[in-house]
Amino acid sequence: MNREFIQSIKYLFFRFLLRRQFLLGKENRFGLKFKFKIEDVVGRRIFKLGKYERDISDFVANNIEFKDGDIALDIGANIGWYSILLNTLMPESGQIYAFEPDPLNFSLLSENILLNKAGNIHAVNKAISDKKESKKLYLYSNRNLGRHSLLESEQGDGVDVEAVQLDQYLLESHVDLSRVKFAKVDIEGYEFYALSGATKVLDYIECLVCEFVPDRMRQGGVDPQDLINLLENKGFYPSIHKAGQLCSVTSAELLNGPACDIVWLKR
């Protein structure tokens, strides 16, 4: 029997017989551990498969190299999958800033940082926007706690969160923008607003992994082309994974295609 089958049986046992509220999933490459709300899809995949978002995670683990003093950003950190993965790649003198506005996700992120002794990570309980303001975070169901969004939604409850402009926050935190080399952004269609307030640090970022959900953006009143234009004007070009390989992609393909994770690299 393979791992997924065995872990799936265990998951059903813990969820429906023991009625556990939280579980611990173990990542199978670096031995990382993640506490998660038992219904949540991110944690379920880690628990059953020992991995999450395989293509992007493997790309990061195999291709991103940090030097002493480098900095990475995780915007929409959720329970910490990418932040803690980045921590394994980062020299002792490096830093990761992990932004997560949702109270439950932030609590789990903080626990997982301690669980993995990931001392390079600074967990920040704030959202990222184009200006400093109070925003409503629209909550998705417990089945996918990573689907919360700052884009207006008619479904689900909301919680008020503090949003900051990324450039301003980093400068006020005395972060050397020139040392920021990598960023991951996954905030359910709000990426354009977040990166509109990051034009200074984008000059230094060499690789940006960014979720792209054109239909959700349009529903929330955002033109997906604006995000593409913003990043291309900063010297980035987009690629996506196809059959395990990183392939270049056109704007038209992105605009007319499904949701995907884009790897933006500098020309």
Q: Over which residues does each language-model region extend?
A:
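Phosphate/nucleotide-binding beta-alpha loop and adjacent structural elements of enzyme active sites
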Residues: 1-267
